[in-house]
Amino acid sequence: MPEQGLADAFGVTEEARAKINLALHVTGQRPDGYHLLDMLVTFADCGDRLGFLPAQADAFTLSGRFGETLAGDGGANLVIRARDLLREAVGTLAFPVHIHLQKNLPVASGIGGGSADAAAALRGLMRLWGTRLPVAALATLALKLGADVPMCLESRPLIARGIGEEIEAVPDLPAFAMVLANPLKGVSTPEVFRRLKAKNNPPLTLAQTAGWLATIGAARNDLEPPAREAVPEIAAISAMLQAEGALLARMSGSGATCFGIFADMAAARDAAAALHEARPDWYFQATETVSGGM
């Protein structure tokens, strides 16, 4: 059996890349309560890792810096739910499996960790079980797991609209040197939406007259002001990123993770090191996002 804590020791491995909301516009709300969003999304080269191995009986193990946070999650974990839904869809091909989740990203932090894990579970299990679902069926299954899971299946730059199910690739979005920063203080997504003052905001437009950085800067995250009210550390962490030379700093998703875009990876690594020295109790990670051409 592979050593616990090392997802790479398993026969099949998958990356669960951090999902970064470069922009998030809340444009309305459906009668069922779901909010309508316009999002510009990219993915980082850091994230969780999952390993998969045939087993006598289903097993799920955890490791990583934030693994203990999920230890009591049990059957509610999205990875387990993804396994069970996919097994229902493929039937007898789905033999028992040991899944190991190396949890490197903060939990409930606005960078799609659980959704990315679920998407990686679907990809890895289809490889292990030697099966594929039709594109439409896989998209439907992914949406059952959560609004962010379909885009995490893509794990490439995209625009997502609706509740996240309307996906359009953005092939010309470049890679960015970035620092992810999180004060390791939980943010309640329902509370952030409750604090949101306007739910019918202007949609996302991408007029690239002055380059991608200016285009992203002209967009916004409508959830950042209410999240800052709930967690004041978000404002502090954004200011710290800017003080370290970030060309743009913004919150991702419903928080509390913020990202800073830097001129290059050397600047990002230097900033992450300085920030970690200033606040060793917080989370800082230098990373590079994927490009649209991948």
UniProtKB/Swiss-Prot annotation:
Pfam families, A to Z: GHMP_kinases_C, GHMP_kinases_N
Enzyme Commission identifier(s): 2.7.1.148
UniProtKB keywords: ATP-binding, Isoprene biosynthesis, Kinase, Nucleotide-binding, Transferase
Positions annotated as active site in the UniProt record: 19, 148
Pathway: Isoprenoid biosynthesis; isopentenyl diphosphate biosynthesis via DXP pathway; isopentenyl diphosphate from 1-deoxy-D-xylulose 5-phosphate: step 3/6
Entry's Gene Ontology BP terms: isopentenyl diphosphate biosynthetic process, methylerythritol 4-phosphate pathway; terpenoid biosynthetic process
Enzyme class label: transferase
Catalytic activity: 4-CDP-2-C-methyl-D-erythritol + ATP = 4-CDP-2-C-methyl-D-erythritol 2-phosphate + ADP + H(+)
InterPro entries per the UniProt record, alphabetical: GHMP_kinase_C_dom (IPR013750), GHMP_kinase_C_sf (IPR036554), GHMP_kinase_N_dom (IPR006204), IspE (IPR004424), Ribosomal_Su5_D2-typ_SF (IPR020568), Ribsml_uS5_D2-typ_fold_subgr (IPR014721)
GO MF, one example: 4-(cytidine 5'-diphospho)-2-C-methyl-D-erythritol kinase activity
SS bonds (residue pairs): none
Residues annotated for ATP binding in this entry: 106-116
Sequence similarity: Belongs to the GHMP kinase family. IspE subfamily.
Record's function text: Catalyzes the phosphorylation of the position 2 hydroxy group of 4-diphosphocytidyl-2C-methyl-D-erythritol.
Protein name per UniProt: 4-diphosphocytidyl-2-C-methyl-D-erythritol kinase
Annotated source species: Rhizobium etli (strain ATCC 51251 / DSM 11541 / JCM 21823 / NBRC 15573 / CFN 42)
